[in-house]
């Protein structure tokens, strides 16, 4: 809902739109044109993109400004090593001409760092896209914190990356792992403040 601050957005006031940007149903709010370009670019082309998440966290934006990108220095990085795409900043994302470039940059990956901009993830479900985003943002947070504390940060070895990926693949349990974590977080939100609904 364009015009609401982030803490005012609830599940019930989200604005539904079609791929042409037309609002479906009733809403007193419009949509963010830049958000529409980014989300619709992926939804139009990526067949299994049931959910696209795009955020501007401090850590994600800070890391998106670093030429080196995401380094493999923690367990979070090890699990997603080689699975993060990058898209160069072209200015505020308001133009249809950027849509095919976004899709080309993403390729077959599910996570993308929009350089000088933020983070994006794609999932076959809301829980899957959220899980990818949580891991990607967490990796950014830790890299920014570690490099702020010291220039002597240890990289993760190739064998540890391979072992981490193998262990994670064994835990995936199809989509159920992401669903379990997502549902646990929903229960937590319900306990704290159910007004998000």
Could you describe each region identified by the protein language model?
Residues 1-197:
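Glycine-rich flexible loops
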């Amino acid at each position: 809902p364009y015009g609401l601050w982030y803490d005012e957005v609830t599940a019930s006031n989200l604005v539904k739109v079609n791929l042409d940007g037309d609002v479906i149903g009733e809403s007193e709010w419009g949509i963010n044109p830049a958000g529409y370009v980014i989300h619709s670019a992926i939804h139009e082309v990526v067949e299994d993109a049931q959910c696209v998440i795009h955020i501007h966290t401090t850590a994600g934006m800070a890391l998106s400004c670093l030429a080196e990108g995401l380094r493999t220095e923690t367990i979070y990085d090890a699990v997603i090593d080689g699975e993060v795409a990058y898209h160069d900043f072209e200015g505020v994302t308001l133009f249809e001409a950027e849509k095919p470039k976004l899709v080309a940059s993403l390729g077959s990956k599910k996570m993308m760092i929009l350089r000088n901009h933020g983070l994006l993830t794609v999932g076959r479900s809301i829980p899957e896209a959220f899980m990818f985003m949580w891991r990607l943002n967490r990796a950014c947070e830790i890299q920014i914190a570690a490099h702020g504390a010291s220039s002597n940060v240890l990289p993760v070895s190739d064998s540890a990356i391979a072992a981490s990926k193998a262990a994670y693949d064994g835990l995936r349990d199809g989509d159920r792992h992401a669903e379990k974590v997502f549902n646990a977080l929903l229960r937590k939100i319900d306990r704290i403040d159910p007004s998000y609904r």
